[in-house]
Amino acid sequence: MHALGRTPALTLLIFIYNFVSVYTIVSVQMGTKARLCCRSIPLTKAVLITWIIKPRGQPSCIMAYKVETKETNETCLGRNITWASTPDHIPDLQISAVALQHEGNYLCEITTPEGNFHKVYDLQVLVPPEVTYFLGENRTAVCEAMAGKPAAQISWTPDGDCVTKSESHSNGTVTVRSTCHWEQNNVSAVSCIVSHSTGNQSLSIELSRGTTSTTPSLLTILYVKMVLLGIILLKVGFAFFQKRNVTRT
């Protein structure tokens, strides 16, 4: 491949890019493939095809193809962004495994003698949350959707007395935790429903019957005391019989 020389045209393209306001929003799940297409313009009319990639929080880069000389200029090396095919056949852009760092805006500009044609994408990366749960005390259950993007929504069946909190992370993901309590003793099982753009999950949770009280603790203490008393009696009895045997001899 040959490289196109850097020209002030790149600065002009980025300037135009910043003022383009019509976006096509594309949501892609992390780890899957993304393919972005240019405008449907016959390549026989194209003079220059340029992709301007502007990831959020990262420097911009370009992928350009000059039709007449078949020269390319690519400054996106190491970002897992490539042509979907050879640009002289299909000038689509491809990301083989989408990651959070690919989120941002992508502009395809096709330059023709009749003018320039643009298509802009706002690539949004979806991250499925890791869903877990655990039982708390006194007929309480906790359901957690960790590191999802966007934030997951948690609901319960049947309804209980619930408190939901969210924690945002530096990479844009969000952890949502819902803690729910049920007073009714007749509720023995509940369901935690986690709703997310990548798919919904439902977890069935068995609750302990009855509310937690001091009775089990008292029974435990009584049981421990009885065991200790039994051990003491055994030791006393063993010492008594041992002493008796010594006296006989």
Curated annotation (Swiss-Prot):
For this protein, the record's PROSITE patterns field holds: IG_LIKE
Cytoplasmic-facing ranges: 242-249
Question: Is Zinc set as a keyword in this record?
Answer: no
Q: Which residues lie on this side of the membrane: Extracellular?
A: 25-220
Positions of the Ig-like V-type domain? 25-124
TM segment ranges:
221-241
UniProt KW Metal-binding keyword: no
- Under the cellular component aspect of Gene Ontology, which terms does the record hold? external side of plasma membrane
Ig-like C2-type domain location:
113-208
Q: Where is the signal peptide?
A: 1-24
MF GO annotations: signaling receptor activity
Q: Major place of localization? A: membrane
Protein's cellular compartments:
Membrane
- One of its Pfam families is C2-set_2
S-S bridge residues: 38-108, 143-192
List the keywords (alphabetical): Disulfide bond, Glycoprotein, Immunoglobulin domain, Membrane, Receptor, Repeat, Signal, Transmembrane, Transmembrane helix
Glyco sites are at: 73, 138, 171
One GO biological process this protein is involved in is:
regulation of neuroinflammatory response
Distribution of this protein across tissues and organs = Expressed in bone marrow, spleen, brain, lung, testis and thymus.
Function as written in the Swiss-Prot or TrEMBL entry: According to PubMed:15187158 it is a receptor for the CD200 cell surface glycoprotein. According to PubMed:16081818 it is not a receptor for the CD200/OX2 cell surface glycoprotein. Involved in the recruitment or surface expression of the TYROBP receptor.
Q: What is this protein called?
A: Cell surface glycoprotein CD200 receptor 2
Lineage per the UniProt record: Eukaryota, Metazoa, Chordata, Craniata, Vertebrata
Task: Name the gene that codes for it.
Answer: Cd200r1l
